[in-house]
Structures are given as structure tokens and as C-alpha cells.
């Protein structure tokens, strides 16, 4: 008999035949349907498959998350490296700007200070060295006294020959015994004429001998007799340099008063091979005597683009010019 819990839908009923004809008993055989038998195991297998798939999915997600995390860590490291490099570049750029700005300001300040000191010194020298005469016997420039340490063997455009004669008179023991005071009125009344040596060459004006001295004629005669064969010192120069000295009247005793062309002439006459290439550069920058005295090797190399050897030579000549030795042999 089939249990009450089972239903006819889930079982297969089969009649069992009996071999006894008198027996009216009917027997049935009940079998469970195959679908119902395999139903529960299939559900279990499906659940296990779903669990495995879920585990695989979770593992894949975790693996991808780990990969993403590693990639983010690498990007973070690279960003740190880039940030350090950028900060280093910014610090270097800021340091260079600050250094250049500081040096520029310092040079500007020192340039103004040195320029002011040079102007004051030049004014003092002009006060000490200029004559007290109301008028000068030079047609173009006022005559200044020669310094004791200045070279006397080179004629300069700013000095007339009477200065050379006056220096010779001071050194002459015979003429030094007869000193005479100099008066502006006597000086303005006498006419200064050029004197001639025995060979007929004109050496200059005799105004150095007739500076208001009543005995100027006797002194002149004595001086011309004792020094008839003496000629003013000269320096062997090329024709170009001599022409430059004659044409350019702007080279004076004080380099701070030179014009741009006077500085160019100084470069040409000092060292033509090394300094002539700087002529156009000096003209373009309008470097006059004051600027020439303030030039340094740093300015020549960094701002003007002069080569090292040329800058060293020019600085050497500028130092000699400041010491008053640039015209010495």
C-alpha cells in the first residue's frame, strides 16, 4: 500500500496480476517517478555550483582590487618623485633670480657710489691743479699743472709745450736761483711767441718763460744757450696713432672727462690687436671715460660678452690708467 504522505501524482501505480482466479484481491505496485527522485539532489548541486561561482567572483574582485591598489601605489610614488623634481627646479629658479637681482642692485648701488666719489675727487683735483689766472693762454683748453708723478716723456694733447719748458726751468739749477712771482696782470700784458732752437725746429710757445717775470728775456736767453741742443722727448708711434693724437683733442689729463671717441682712441693706441675689436661694442654702449674707469672683469665677461683674455688685458690697462701709468713706455 502506498503511504498517505505520497500522492498519486508523484508515484506510478502498476497492477500486479494474481495467479489465483478465485482470489479477487487486486494488488498494485507503486513506484516513485524519476523526476521526483532526482529533484532534491539537483537542487543541492545547483546550490553548490552557485557557491563556487560566488567564491570565484569574490576572488576575482579581490585580485582586481589588489592590482588597482598596487597601480595606485606606483602612481603615488611617481607623483612624489615628480613633485620633488618640480620643487627642486622651482628652488633653483628662485635662487638664481634672487642672486641676479641682488647682484644687479649691488652693482647699481656701487656704480652710483663710485661715480659720486670719482666726481668729488675730480672736482678736488681741478681745484688744486687749475691756475688762478683770469684767462688761459691755450686757445682750446685750460692749462693745468703737471703732477710730480706724471710721466714727462710723452706729449699729450691737453698739455702745451710751455708746461714742459716750465718743468725744465724748475729742474735747472741756474734758473731756479732767480725765482720771480707770477702776477695775472703781467701775464696778460705779455705776448707769448714760439721760440726756435739752433736747428730751426719750433718746439712750442715761450709763454712758460714769460709768466709775468720782468727778467723773462734774460732767462730765455740763458735757457736757450744752455739747452739749444735739447729737444722735447718724443715717442715713436705709427702715423695712424700720431694723426689720432693730432685730430683728437678729447684725450685729457683726467680719463673721467673722456668722451666716447676719446675712449675709442685710447683702445686703438694702447693695444690695437687686442682692443680694436671692442671699438664698435664701446660705441654701441656709449662707454665714456667715467664708465671705462668703472668697468670690471665681471661686467666685461657677463654683460658685454668680452672674451677672458681681452677682459684681463683691458682691466690691466684700466688699472694702469687709474695709476697714471698708461702712457709710460
Swiss-Prot record:
Name positions with the PTM Phosphoserine: 138, 238
Where the record annotates domain SAM, the positions are 258-325
Q: What InterPro entries does the record tag this protein with? A: SAM, SAM/pointed_sf, SAM_Scm-like
Tell me the segments the record calls region Disordered.
138-157
Q: Which GO terms describe its molecular function?
A: chromatin binding; histone binding
Instruction: Name the protein family.
Output: Belongs to the SCM family.
Q: What does this protein do?
A: Putative Polycomb group (PcG) protein. PcG proteins act by forming multiprotein complexes, which are required to maintain the transcriptionally repressive state of homeotic genes throughout development. May be involved in spermatogenesis during sexual maturation.
Q: What is this protein called?
A: Sex comb on midleg-like protein 1
- Gene symbol of the encoding locus: SCML1
Amino acid at each position: 500500500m502506498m503511504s498517505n504522505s505520497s500522492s498519486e501524482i508523484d508515484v506510478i501505480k502498476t497492477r500486479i496480476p494474481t495467479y489465483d482466479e478465485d482470489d479477487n484481491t487486486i494488488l498494485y505496485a507503486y513506484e516513485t517517478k524519476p523526476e521526483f527522485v532526482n529533484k532534491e539532489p539537483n537542487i543541492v548541486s545547483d546550490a553548490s555550483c552557485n557557491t563556487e561561482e560566488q567564491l570565484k567572483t569574490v576572488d576575482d574582485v579581490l585580485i582586481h582590487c589588489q592590482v588597482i591598489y598596487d597601480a595606485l601605489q606606483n602612481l603615488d610614488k611617481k607623483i612624489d618623485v615628480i613633485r620633488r623634481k618640480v620643487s627642486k627646479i622651482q628652488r633653483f629658479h628662485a635662487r638664481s633670480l634672487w642672486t641676479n637681482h641682488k647682484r644687479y642692485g649691488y652693482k647699481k648701488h656701487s656704480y652710483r657710489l663710485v661715480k659720486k666719489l670719482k666726481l668729488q675727487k675730480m672736482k678736488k683735483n681741478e681745484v688744486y691743479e687749475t691756475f688762478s689766472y683770469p684767462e688761459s693762454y691755450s686757445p682750446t683748453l685750460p692749462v693745468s699743472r703737471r703732477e710730480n708723478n706724471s710721466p714727462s716723456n710723452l706729449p699729450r694733447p691737453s698739455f702745451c709745450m710751455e708746461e714742459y719748458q716750465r718743468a725744465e726751468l724748475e729742474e735747472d739749477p741756474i734758473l731756479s736761483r732767480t725765482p720771480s712771482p707770477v702776477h695775472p696782470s703781467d701775464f696778460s700784458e705779455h705776448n707769448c711767441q714760439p721760440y726756435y732752437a739752433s736747428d730751426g725746429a719750433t718746439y712750442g710757445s715761450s709763454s712758460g718763460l714769460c709768466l709775468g717775470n720782468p727778467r723773462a728775456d734774460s732767462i730765455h736767453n740763458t735757457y736757450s744757450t744752455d739747452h739749444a741742443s735739447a729737444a722735447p722727448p718724443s715717442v715713436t708711434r705709427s702715423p695712424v696713432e700720431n694723426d689720432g693724437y693730432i685730430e683728437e683733442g678729447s684725450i685729457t689729463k683726467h680719463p673721467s672727462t673722456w668722451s666716447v671717441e676719446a675712449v675709442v682712441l685710447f683702445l686703438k693706441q694702447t693695444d690695437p690687436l687686442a682692443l680694436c675689436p671692442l671699438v664698435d661694442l664701446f660705441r654701441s654702449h656709449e662707454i665714456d671715460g667715467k664708465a671705462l674707469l668703472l668697468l670690471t672683469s665681471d661686467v666685461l665677461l657677463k654683460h658685454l660678452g668680452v672674451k677672458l683674455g681681452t677682459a684681463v688685458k683691458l682691466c690691466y690697462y684700466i688699472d694702469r690708467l687709474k695709476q697714471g701709468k698708461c702712457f709710460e713706455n
